């Protein structure tokens, strides 16, 4: 499945801590997301699904996610229909091995293009 991963204005990756969750873009935005850290060895910190602005807001206050903040935290998301989300999240978790989160949907993975 080919999905459109979102970037912020200027075609740059969105910083987790400052992306404007009040922007109209987030109204009714549901799907999957990826949070990663920068630095010399960038890595995926968390993947998930749901109402994007709510999930991002939650992870801004999650100590496990914020432990990687000194490396720079970034987020991207894609709108995915509800019936595909579990499979897409399962694929992302298997492919990206996030550092935080251990319970992912036990379903057949649905492969999607990665944002990088």
Per-region residue spans from a language model:
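GIY-YIG nuclease catalytic motif and its immediate N-terminal context
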Residues: 1-50, 57-58, 80-91, 114-116
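Coupling/hinge elements of helicase-like and P-loop NTPase modules
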Residues: 98-113
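Short, intrinsically disordered/low-complexity patches at protein termini
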Residues: 68-71, 79-81, 110-112
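A broadly used, surface-exposed interaction patch
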Residues: 54-76
């Amino acid at each position: 499945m080919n999905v459109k991963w979102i970037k912020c204005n200027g075609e740059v990756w969105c910083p987790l801590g400052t992306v404007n969750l009040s922007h109209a873009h987030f109204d009714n935005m549901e799907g999957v997301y990826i949070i990663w850290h920068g630095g010399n060895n960038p890595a995926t910190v968390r993947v998930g699904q749901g109402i994007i602005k709510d999930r991002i807001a939650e992870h801004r206050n999650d100590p496990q996610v914020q432990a990687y903040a000194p490396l720079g935290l970034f987020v991207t998301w894609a709108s995915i229909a509800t019936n595909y989300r579990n499979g897409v999240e399962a694929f992302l978790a298997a492919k990206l091995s996030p550092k935080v989160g251990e319970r992912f949907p036990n379903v057949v993975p649905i492969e999607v293009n990665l944002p990088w």
